[in-house]
Amino acid sequence: MARVGAKSSGAGAKKKGVSFVIDCSKPVDDTILEIATLEKFLQERIKVRGKAGALGNSVSITRYNGKINVNANSNFSKRYLKYLTKKYLKKYNLRDWLRVIASNKDKNVYEVRYFRIDDEVASYEED
């Protein structure tokens, strides 16, 4: 049964490209995280049309100054990028010290930050 009043996107509709940034500058400066391995991991694992590593012209990944920029010409989920980044941290045993959070400043930016352990240390000192 067809939906009444639903408009289909015609041939004239353009796919909107999206751009996401993963900011890893603090862990990279401390040499805990290697940005080249994260870039390679994303290139190998991002799936386009069901195939991993076949980015083609639809997805491009670049790195600069501790940040990775992912540009997609087609639909691309921000959540999928977070999932892959967390998977990378788990693979290289960094998940215990680092976490991936969305930036408050910009909608399309993820930040890789350290867990805040100074609050826990203060609570242990009080006991």
Curated annotation (Swiss-Prot):
GO CC, sorted alphabetically, is: cytosolic large ribosomal subunit
Swiss-Prot/TrEMBL GO biological process terms:
translation
Superkingdom of this protein's organism: Eukaryota
InterPro entries on file: Ribosomal_eL22, Ribosomal_eL22_sf
Is Methyltransferase there in the keyword field? Answer: no
Which controlled-vocabulary keywords does the entry list? Ribonucleoprotein, Ribosomal protein
Q: Name one GO molecular function term.
A: structural constituent of ribosome
Which Pfam families does the record cross-reference, listed alphabetically? Ribosomal_L22e (PF01776)
Family classification? Belongs to the eukaryotic ribosomal protein eL22 family.
The name on file for this protein is: Large ribosomal subunit protein eL22x
